[in-house]
Amino acid sequence: PSTRLSQFSLNGEARDYKGDPFKRLANALRDDFALTGTKVGCDAGDCGACTVLIDGRQACACMVAMAQTDGCEITTVEGLSSAGELNPLQRAFLHHGAAQCGICTPGMLMAATELLNREPEPDRTSVEDALGGVLCRCTGYQTIIDAVMDAHTFTEATPARHHGPSVGSRLERIDGVAKVNGTDQFGADSAPADALWLRLYRSPHARATFQVGDLGEFVAGSDG
């Protein structure tokens, strides 16, 4: 297969990619750069789970070929934290319980980041418009919208809610930090070193008639 060198900034660091120019950015982030915070949902640009920032604008990484990334500045959910400290938006997500199952969370954070870079104190309509390309099945969107609208009131130093036996008190999710910084591991994010992999082969013919010939020679040469 043909290869092409792409050079770009990834979360503030200069990176090189030499490989299939048609490989999707979402897959390259996960496979080649081990950044599994970017999730692949529909793989068709509909759900928005794979949203990243390219030159400051939100984009579905599953729809961007690596050949298009040369010279770009790419930011993923892993690039939001600084020195291990959550940024104000991530802290707002924890406070409002905006990260539930976590699949859409990275995409929501990146879409919201683009908005907040332009409008630090957006109104509800602006937030709804900015998040319109990212689908969520858990939250009903209200907590996410609240978090984005309140993000300007948080800082990196905003203390977390108390963790412990506090009956009647609102607590942050135990796994909340991992969900908002992109380190939470889902089924497709890791595999044992000795895992067996399957490859799906599709017929190049949309409509074809198959004729089964004599299988005797094949059966004779096959064990079992």
Question: What does each of the following model-derived ranges do?
Answer:
Residues H152-G224:
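Flexible, low-hydrophobicity surface segments
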Residues P1-H162, G168:
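Signature of N-terminal electron-transfer/Fe-S-associated modules in redox systems
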